[in-house]
Amino acid sequence: MEALVYTFLLVSTLGIIFFAIFFREPPKVPDKGGK
């Protein structure tokens, strides 16, 4: 059942990278309030 774990890890990493790029492209929220 190692294939399942590897697939999950790969999908998770890809998803995180995709989300990061997607949220980085449209800078609508100003970064002046800290968090």
Swiss-Prot record:
Membrane topology recorded in Swiss-Prot or TrEMBL: Single-pass membrane protein
Keywords, alphabetical: Chloroplast, Membrane, Photosynthesis, Photosystem II, Plastid, Thylakoid, Transmembrane, Transmembrane helix
Residues in the signal sequence: none
Domain of life per record: Eukaryota
Compartment(s) where it occurs, according to its Swiss-Prot or TrEMBL record: Plastid, Chloroplast thylakoid membrane
TM segment ranges: 3-23
Main location: plastid
Family indicated by similarity: Belongs to the PsbT family.
Protein name in the entry: Photosystem II reaction center protein T
Taxonomic path: Eukaryota, Viridiplantae, Streptophyta, Embryophyta, Tracheophyta
Gene that encodes the chain: psbT
